[in-house]
Amino acid sequence: MSRRLFTSESVTEGHPDKIADQISDTILDALLREDPTSRVAVETLITTGLVHVAGEVTTKAYADIANLVRGKILEIGYDSSKKGFDGASCGVSVSIGAQSPDIAQGVDTAYENRVEGDEDELDRQGAGDQGLMFGYASDETPTLMPLPVFLAHRLSKRLSEVRKNGTIPYLRPDGKTQVTIEYDGDKAVRLDTVVVSSQHASDIDLESLLAPDIKEFVVEPELKALLEDGIKIDTENYRLLVNPTGRFEIGGPMGDAGLTGRKIIIDTYGGMARHGGGAFSGKDPSKVDRSAAYAMRWVAKNVVAAGLAARCEVQVAYAIGKAEPVGLFVETFGTAKVDTEKIEKAIDEVFDLRPAAIIRALDLLRPIYAQTAAYGHFGRELPDFTWERTDRVDALREAAGL
């Protein structure tokens, strides 16, 4: 078997791009809470002292956007100019218009209904845009996620937790993690490198304080948790790099401007699978960029959980205004237990991938999205993350002839 290194990264909730994602999804949730039929496409730009929210919204709901923005920033931990940003005093500007009636026509009355005369209720809603979406699952972790991004997310989440609970009180909200895993063929065998970069207060010594604290309170507990989860890889002689620049005092929006949708690989599979290019945050589920990507994760995870393959990547494609997908493709990387064509037919039989059917099956018209906007949309088995359920395993096995 050939040995190779594969790397994935994650960022904390205080990273500027993730602040933008969380603001966009907080606004989306507020609108869905009052009006589940809201059509929302909200983008956020955040820079030193200023947040700008723009996009298209059609809704019966009212949202106090400035207060939502400030509340989310304060919740993340930017509450003082000493940290580079203060949610209580930052400027907030809003430029939001209505959804284009040309787009609305195709979503509200799909091609199948409008042109072909189909009266099926699920054929009435068309895709909100053209595009291709991918889903992926692998049997290398308990949540069927690739190990590099699985561990990177856990490290970034713990980095935020030790800041918030006071374990490492001098940390600031901005931070990043990166994990390099050695593979022997498709099997993860060794942890090679961990990189942790965290914003911190001034006058903190890297070698005598920050690096030892990061190793003791962030990295080592997560490596122990890997063993508890049954993930057996060599973690004895990994390389740990903490703040390799030597200093990280200026962070958050003061260090870098943040934009919604700029962390799409972190949001998904850490580069282990392909990506169709569409971001998630700030988009209601009529946008297949989001809902179909969630559905593809649901499909791929059920395929692997059903034992049909050890790795599975599924692509779906849509035409704007059309309900039925225009394409479905399954890749199992040589790990399929049955013919890949059988898996594809089983997916087609078991899953209805029309947008309205996805929204109904996964119960997506709920205010659940702010919690997706940091630490990965996939691989976290939370009650609201319906796309993480393995509820079609038996049906897939039967359809595939197992």
UniProtKB/Swiss-Prot annotation:
InterPro entries: ADOMET_SYNTHASE_CS (IPR022631), S-AdoMet_synt_C (IPR022630), S-AdoMet_synt_central (IPR022629), S-AdoMet_synt_N (IPR022628), S-AdoMet_synthetase (IPR002133), S-AdoMet_synthetase_sfam (IPR022636). Pathway: Amino-acid biosynthesis; S-adenosyl-L-methionine biosynthesis; S-adenosyl-L-methionine from L-methionine: step 1/1. It is found in: Cytoplasm. Pfam families: S-AdoMet_synt_C, S-AdoMet_synt_M, S-AdoMet_synt_N. The keyword Iron does not apply. It comes from the Bacteria. CDD domains: S-AdoMet_synt (cd18079). GO terms for biological process: one-carbon metabolic process; S-adenosylmethionine biosynthetic process. GO terms for cellular component: cytosol. ATP binds at H15, D174, G175, K176, R247, F248, D256, R262, K263, A279, K283. L-methionine binds at E56, Q99, D256, K287. It catalyses: L-methionine + ATP + H2O = S-adenosyl-L-methionine + phosphate + diphosphate. Mg(2+) binds at D17. PANTHER family: S-ADENOSYLMETHIONINE SYNTHETASE. Belongs to the AdoMet synthase family. Homotetramer; dimer of dimers. This is S-adenosylmethionine synthase.
